[in-house]
Amino acid sequence: YKRQPHTQKLISMFPKVPRFQDFRQMFDKMADKIDAVTVGVPDHAHFPITIEAMAHGKHVYVEKPMARTFQEIEVMMRAEKKFGVVTQMGNQGHSEANYFQFKAWKEAGLIKDVTAITAHMNSPRRWHNWNPNITHMPMGEPVPETLDWDTWLGVRPFHEYNHDYHLGQWR
């Protein structure tokens, strides 16, 4: 598959790093050289990648959401125990300095008697111009030559490509 110019530039900075289009091939070829795995891919791929990594004895940090269903999470919890690994679901927004600063102020006694915290979000998809009221699958479009659509779909049922599914719009 053809690579985007910005991707090619980054790849050229690390010419000796192995690259794989499919995580299963990566584990097949070099699982013994991997200490831990970070999963930051479309939501529907979190479960299969996390399970595969744990089956290889790898600790896993998986981005939110950890999985799509409670059943997937229960399977992950059993796998974590079975394979003796540590697995964590993270949220980069809740791992930033402001949260640690608040904790330090609270522990120092500068902030006392917190009874409630109210948070607001100004849009259901504030990072994208995406219509949250979609009622049907978008029309199919040609798959870009830089994308392996079948691998991207992974465990999802097949449907035609549309740019609205790509670059963070799969939710």
Please name every model-derived segment.
Residues 1, 152:
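Conserved small/polar residues in nucleotide/adenosyl-binding loops
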Residues 6-7, 126-128, 160-162:
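Short, solvent-exposed loop/turn elements at domain surfaces
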Residues 24-25, 92, 122, 157:
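Residues that form or immediately flank small-molecule/cofactor binding pockets and catalytic motifs
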Residues 154-171:
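Glycine-rich phosphate/pyrophosphate-binding loop
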Residues 38-41, 45, 106, 121, ...:
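Sec/Tat-exported extracytoplasmic proteins
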Residues 59-61, 67-146, 151:
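A contiguous active-site-proximal alpha/beta segment in oxidoreductase catalytic domains
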Residues 2-59, 71-86:
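N-terminal glycine-/serine-/threonine-rich beta1-alpha1-beta2 phosphate-ribose binding loop
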